[in-house]
């Protein structure tokens, strides 16, 4: 892919077997997000990034039992593949806009922060719940994963053999 920056300079992004790149368009095709899993800087953007950036928002139903706020797009897709609703902001460290949380609370009975099981994910999900617990029905779900690069998020949880039923059971266990 090649682009022209706002300063008029051209640049290109090239994928190879050694450096794969995945991308998807957002914001009506006005922007693109690249994921480079083997690069030091794994994420890149080009075009117009909506503010706030929320992946999955337009796929949410008007109402429902629960919605998950996750750390990334892959998490949202993994949840959807198992019949759950989710969204992701730009990262786990992104601040959740109060107006969006208010809207979610009007549409869903519960909002669950489902961040990675690493140090950052645990810290940030605890902070989000602390920030909003007195105003909205928010909680956090801690996955029983070691928090390593290979075992930290919901896609890893399902990849190691857990089922949709196991996930529902985990939700119910942590609720009590």
Predicted regions: what they are:
Residues 63-67, 73-176:
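TOPRIM fold recognition
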Residues 1-108, 124-125:
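Phosphate-handling DNA/RNA-contact segment within nucleic-acid enzymes
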């Amino acid at each position: 892919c090649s682009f022209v920056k706002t300063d008029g300079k051209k640049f290109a992004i090239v994928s190879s077997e050694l450096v794969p790149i995945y991308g998807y368009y957002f914001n009506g095709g006005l922007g693109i997000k690249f994921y480079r899993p083997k690069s030091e800087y794994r994420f890149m953007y080009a075009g117009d990034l909506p503010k706030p950036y929320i992946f999955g928002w337009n796929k949410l139903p008007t109402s429902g039992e629960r919605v998950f706020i996750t750390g990334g797009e892959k998490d949202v897709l993994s949840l959807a593949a198992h019949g759950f609703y989710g969204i992701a902001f730009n990262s786990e460290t992104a601040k959740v806009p109060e107006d969006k949380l208010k809207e979610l609370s009007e549409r869903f009975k519960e909002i669950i922060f489902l961040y990675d099981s690493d140090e950052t994910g645990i810290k940030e999900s605890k902070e989000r719940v602390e920030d909003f617990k007195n105003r909205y029905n928010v909680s956090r779900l801690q996955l029983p994963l070691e928090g390593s690069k290979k075992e930290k998020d919901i896609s890893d949880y399902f990849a190691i053999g857990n089922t949709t039923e196991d996930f529902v059971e985990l939700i119910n266990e942590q609720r009590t």
